[in-house]
């Protein structure tokens, strides 16, 4: 089969580049000094019997972080970033993730505990590995790179070739070619990407096989890494030969199980190798890669892209390697792994030739300038080893003082970075914060998540066979369809609540600006609220707390409201303090005092300067991707200033509170203060009743209450309902400006999956 010719003739270059990608990353949990910890796997991650993202490898201290498969490699790296951030923020304060592959700060072997898994056989298997290979070699960590050739490409290629009549046999032959050519040329990736030049002497036991001060390219990929006994040789001439030789060594007792055979390529798609002959290989797992200590998550996107196109090159090559070539590749692997990382490799000519073939392939399949630049940069590293990861690593180790010290330093640095925006997942920063918080908790607890539509905040969440859909963090099938429609229409909301016996302020509705302005005499001198009939998040609302006294100001407020809707309400202003109640089901989970947007004068700065200073708080942003919203100085704010006899250029006296908004929505720059524990229980019960009246499961209820410490009475002097909101914001409760955090996303998960342990 002439794969190159078929791709060129039938213009399959784009399809050839597609596939699915996944990454598994092993790392040790360590203390601040780089010593491997002996603590149990954190219970906050739930059970390892089902967790899809956060597992343990050999040891209880050895994390294994697993991304879901993605069609875009960039999405796989985003998931790796998110899982990493969740893990780092969930570890005890004193624990870190070691960023280097070779272990440092090893405890005596009898203190290293195999992963304590629920499946007894899994524990016994690890104990077997300890006896055969020793625990220290099992503590080596790395990256596993999973790649599935595009199914569509395989099917199209099968239809065009004439060598194979069976599609499964064809698929298996394609993956065997990929695996064997990879094993033949894997040394190239070791030269370019290896990062294990040394290890602490304790790793070797009594005597190190390396000379004092000797550096190598990759101890992990050398004979001193985790390798099987020399006599265990698996035949790669065909998949059938591969299966039979693997079964032979298991039957003879040389291997306890098929998975004990360690190879830098593992063919995946079935529990037993023999099943691959009938079912076909689904994807290949490449297990060669050292952790890149200069990448916070162990691998960069550029290197992941390079690996992808290197794998495509292994398919592109016309020759198909058999067992003899695989053995040659193993010899070259060990040779390059033990070379001095400061010197060019003895195999430079072959390495350059393969990457030049990659560049020719890129041109033929029109891969683009970006990946071409990445490959050219790698090609140049054959002539300059200092540009490789190892070249940079040697200098970094010298600067830090030791391998272990560098690892500890980077581990602390990467954990600090993960906490810089502790309220967000940096890889999914374009999603709203409530969805990011929910994603965090879903990853932490081990539920399968699929992002159906990132821009629309739509998730599919699965636990076992139980599937739920979530939009915007808390919109689910548990709410009636009619509920948000009722709450979106403020007139209907008030009528429904009034019929249910709840206190609501009087209001008048208008359908045009002129109609509303004509009724100005009815409201002159009265404290009123002007707002769109259908709104959420406080949009288009103006409040005249001291009474409206100017027709032009009234008109302007009416015009602002009409920008948000075709109908506008003018409502009596209720005296008291506004509180937001977050209700889920039959319980009020959180109560928040939202202080309207304000600044406090210092006698020096103007209002504008005070606003700029307050907006510099890192918690303030656009309000959907930050817990607090930056304060604006728009029309509504300037109207509010005018009521106080101020302008943006006024200089308030020291301690003077300047109100920039009358409404207290966080989405318009307000401050959030948790009042859950201070609020009288009677008001919490009222909020639950209001939610039930709306037919909702999740609701944000806004109540005006003059005195939160006194029990509710059945009149407007005691309390009144301002609004009921669908899809209420959760971030202001999770990350309040002041007070206790209420992790509402966890309550949403419990509502959706009550069976979750």
Annotate each PLM feature:
Residues 1-130, 137-141, 177:
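Terminal catalytic/cofactor-binding subdomain
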